Amino acid sequence: MTNLLLQGVGMTSLRTRERLIQRLRDQGVTNLRVLDIMLNTPRHLFLDEALAHRAYEDTALPIGHGQTLSQPYIVARMTELLLGAAGKLNKVLEVGTGSGYQTSLLAQLVPEVYTVERIKPLQDKARERLHQLGLRNIRYRHADGGFGWPDMGAYDGILSTAAPQVVPDELLKQLAPGGVLVIPVGGREQQLHLIIRDTEDTEKFVTQILEPVKFVPFLSGTAR
């Protein structure tokens, strides 16, 4: 991949990205690692060419198959929550690969990233993009995200990019002691949840309900 493609041109320029990062700061995002990685990650590469000029708007955008690339603010917010609430993050599970953009941020922050996607064409395209960006610390699974990836757990952090009606028990079981789950929960009305597994009583989970959000629904099964 050429430097020109990575840097972007016109609406994907560094100045455009810098304006987005300033908006995120204005909205309360403070983690400098998250902001720096978002500044330097080419979000336009995770969209079809027709939408690439809108990549640095603070809005969700369609990626096909009824899915979306999440609003940059909520991506930054959830990533910041994951980093801030957990201890040392060595291994993270992402539920919902989608475009691969959130995956790319996690892979620059965490040594091991495991990502599960139910829609095969989306994951294939995401894998190709992430490979082009040189990110090699990611493992992929095509499966129902509600079951997580138990064979590879336990995880220091789990981040879900879709909203179930209730938190799946399987995801809670795959958290390591002290592990953190960041997940939107609900139907028409959704709330962002931060759930931490107790380090001593591992049957105990502490839940914080943070703010209203809007995500695509958490669906069961797989699609090809």
Swiss-Prot record:
InterPro entries: PCMT, SAM-dependent_MTases_sf
A GO biological process held by the record: protein repair
GO MF term list: protein-L-isoaspartate (D-aspartate) O-methyltransferase activity
Keyword Metal-binding: no
Main localization, broad class: cytoplasm
Keywords assigned by UniProt, alphabetized: Cytoplasm, Methyltransferase, S-adenosyl-L-methionine, Transferase
Enzyme Commission code(s) on record: 2.1.1.77
Catalytic activity annotation: [protein]-L-isoaspartate + S-adenosyl-L-methionine = [protein]-L-isoaspartate alpha-methyl ester + S-adenosyl-L-homocysteine
Gene Ontology terms: cellular component: cytoplasm
UniProt xrefs under CDD domains: AdoMet_MTases (cd02440)
Active site, per annotation: S70
Keyword S-adenosyl-L-methionine: yes
Compartment(s) where it occurs, according to its Swiss-Prot or TrEMBL record: Cytoplasm
Pfam families the UniProt entry points to: PCMT (PF01135)
Membership in a protein family: Belongs to the methyltransferase superfamily. L-isoaspartyl/D-aspartyl protein methyltransferase family.
Listed NCBIfam families: pimt, PRK00312.1
Chain's role: Catalyzes the methyl esterification of L-isoaspartyl residues in peptides and proteins that result from spontaneous decomposition of normal L-aspartyl and L-asparaginyl residues. It plays a role in the repair and/or degradation of damaged proteins.
Protein name (Swiss-Prot/TrEMBL): Protein-L-isoaspartate O-methyltransferase
Organism: Cellvibrio japonicus (strain Ueda107)
UniProt lineage: Bacteria, Pseudomonadati, Pseudomonadota, Gammaproteobacteria, Cellvibrionales
Primary gene name: pcm
